[in-house]
């Protein structure tokens, strides 16, 4: 199995603006498929990407490194896959008013479902971040998808229900 995936996008905006979008807390992150990020960004702390109402958790991780506005490293596990966590590294570099965002997703050992899923989803996420930072919104097609996802949230896998995530049972 491949050991790492690298995805890059260049965004015509200062690094501070891009960083603010990537690390936005407790608000809907349209680029991240309408999820809400909860964490305190301290190394060792838990992080989750959840539904707006908090009833579903899609991604669970642990903060490994947080160096604003340049680097953000965390583990990553889809709650609906019975797979071990992988590692995500966000690296941002600004040159001449353009910010290069590099996402390196690694530590795939037996995580075939995760690897297959993120191979295409990172491309869409980075494209959406670029659109939000440069234009103020995600592309029209993404807005439609987000509406559909919201309307059909009740059909999301049962493994995403907060009550079904073993690591979160004590924080119900």
Where are these regions (language model features)?
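Hydrophobic ligand-binding cavity/cleft-lining segments
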Residues: 1-38, 164-172
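Hydrophobic pocket/interface hotspot
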Residues: 18-22, 28, 47-49, 63, ...
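Hydrophobic-ligand binding "helix-grip"
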Residues: 37-38, 53-111
